[in-house]
């Protein structure tokens, strides 16, 4: 079994430190005090240009529950496109129904 070491980072300095310490990939987010939200596009671009390991980007439009209204899901779809265009190797996202189950319809989009 191969173990993949992922560093959760919120800045270019943290990304460099994780990469230099041997991480296999990064999860790039912002504001860990609220369990993370989507970072700005400029940060994603800077990390992708400076770091040689894959950077996965959290797409979470707001703190709080992972239950999203249809308009929030649509906005997150656009954010996914923006993060991929900025060079993200992958996307980290989650969504739940109001019953607490995985919102497969939202995640398929």
Feature map (PLM): residue ranges:
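N-terminal pre-domain/capping segments
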Residues: 1-24, 31
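A short acidic, helix-capping loop that chelates divalent metal ions and anchors anionic groups
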Residues: 63-68
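Hydrophobic faces of well-ordered beta-strands that scaffold small-molecule active sites
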Residues: 3-7, 26-28, 55-59, 91-93
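Conserved, mostly hydrophobic/aromatic
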Residues: 18, 47, 83
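Ordered, amphipathic secondary-structure segments that act as subunit-interaction surfaces
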Residues: 78-102
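Active-site-adjacent beta->alpha loops and helix N-cap segments on the catalytic face
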Residues: 12-13, 32-56, 70-75, 95-109
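Structural motif
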Residues: 21, 50, 85-87
């Amino acid at each position: 079994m191969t173990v993949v070491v992922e560093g959760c980072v919120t800045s270019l300095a943290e990304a460099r430190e994780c990469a230099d310490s041997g991480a296999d990939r990064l999860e790039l987010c912002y504001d860990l005090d609220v369990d993370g939200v989507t970072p700005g596009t400029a940060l994603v671009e800077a990390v992708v240009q400076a770091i040689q390991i894959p950077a996965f980007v959290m797409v979470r439009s707001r703190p709080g529950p992972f239950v999203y209204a249809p308009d929030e899901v649509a906005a997150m779809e656009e954010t996914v496109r923006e993060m991929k265009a900025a060079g993200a190797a992958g996307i980290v996202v989650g969504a739940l129904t109001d019953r607490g189950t995985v919102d497969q319809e939202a995640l398929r989009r």
